[in-house]
Amino acid sequence: MAVNNQLVNQDNKKPSVGATIATFLSGEAVKKNIADVVGKTNSTRFVTSIVSAVQNTPALKECTNVSIFSAALLGQGLELSPSPQLGQFYMVPFEDKKAGIKQATFVLGYKGYIQLAIRSGQYKRLNVMAIKEGELQYFDPLSEEISVNLMVDNWDAREKAKTIGYYAFFELTNGFKKAMYWSIDQMINHADKYSPAFSKNATNGKYPKVSYADYLAGNYDKKDAWLYSSFWYKDFDGMAYKTMLRQLIGKWGPMSISMQNAFAADNAVVDQNGFPVTYPEQEEAEMPTVDTTATEETVQEQQAPDQQQDINDILFN
């Protein structure tokens, strides 16, 4: 995957007012680049996915077009969809204060990890799930033996039950098995340690935050909601699943070249060749809020007429 240097040079500055992603994608050099990388038959779907992603995350409109394009091309190269409804990968806005611009980072979702693992053909079974209160009987970290009594007779009650931990497991086609269990406290501590955008305890900095427990209880000023825009606040389970898979596969699982590239680029601003340039802190990220019950096809079917016309103009004019 490569972005023409001409595209980088034309976008190596703050996005100007009105310089929309549609305008950028309509350039002859960009259209040629798209056709060369994804093929003419896939161009419409690719452009549609970018436009839809930008509409779902308005803050992306303030990002450099090349950073959006590069992240989207990387996802395309991995054969993953940027649709927030599918949760395979996201393009997340990041404010680069040193450069004075906003850039889009490539963020792999846990469903993207699963897709890449399945496609490798080396995983016979792969699963990750939340363990609810009352379900865990025991877990031996040495033997990795676990005993759970899942509430399979009442999934509605299970959905509402308190999460006490997370379990991930894989079995390879050659019979090798590996499993992990983390308590909810382990996961919260992990997020607190590695995510600058998440705080387990209350903070008193320039922008004070309430503790995570108070956030869950709704004990925070709603005008400060932007302080809690990290996925660790908006979708803790999703981030926990991703963390479990990344820990499990990264340490013990075989990884294809595609998965290695995805691991390396995760949470990074990527360059024109899909390689990570920087791993920004995500305090400024505005995460998309979507209806996860929707499908990618539904999103495309419900596109506004002017959006579809923009796409037609981009590809065929």
Feature-to-residue mapping (PLM):
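Glycine- and charge-rich intrinsically disordered segments
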Residues: 1-32, 260-317
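Binding-interface segments
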Residues: 16-255
